[in-house]
């Protein structure tokens, strides 16, 4: 969680522009609701979508993801969404599943190392 907090702070300092895939708020809601309840889950989603940009998941992205030779379709969708918006990279704790991604992929720690320190 320290890396997530560091990424959030770096985004607040405008060291980078942060995007999440359209599926991310849904996943956050599901996980937080199970742990903390529906009200906290809605607050978490509201904070996420009001603070970060959201990559739209449309038919073009879903089709493009099928052409990416990745095992996990959801991961491929995230890559396709990032590519469609011409983003520079994907940041994920699960870098091993992104070996065939068509865009650079960084772990949170590796991405943080590339950012300014002030």
Residue positions per predicted region:
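Short amphipathic alpha-helical segments and helix-helix/interface helices
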Residues: 5-9, 45, 78-79
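Acidic, PIN/NYN-like endoribonuclease modules and their adjacent C-terminal/linker elements
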Residues: 6, 51, 83-118
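Short, well-structured N-terminal submotif of metal-dependent ribonuclease cores
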Residues: 1-20, 33-40, 100, 112, ...
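Active-site neighborhoods of divalent-metal-dependent phosphate/nucleic-acid chemistry enzymes
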Residues: 53-95
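Short, flexible helix/strand-to-coil boundary loops that buttress conserved ligand/catalytic motifs
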Residues: 32, 69, 102
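Extended, non-globular alpha-helical segments
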Residues: 45-51
């Amino acid at each position: 969680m320290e890396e997530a907090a560091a990424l959030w702070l770096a985004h607040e300092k405008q060291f980078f522009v942060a995007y999440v895939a359209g599926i991310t708020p849904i996943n956050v809601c599901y996980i937080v609701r199970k742990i903390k309840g529906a009200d906290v889950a809605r607050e978490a989603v509201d904070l996420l979508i009001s603070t970060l940009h959201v990559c739209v998941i449309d038919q073009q992205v879903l089709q493009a993801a099928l052409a990416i030779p990745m095992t996990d379709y959801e991961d491929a969708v995230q890559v396709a969404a990032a590519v469609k918006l011409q983003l520079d990279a994907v940041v994920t704790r699960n870098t091993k599943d992104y070996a065939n991604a068509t865009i650079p992929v960084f772990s949170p720690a590796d991405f943080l190392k590339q950012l300014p320190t002030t």
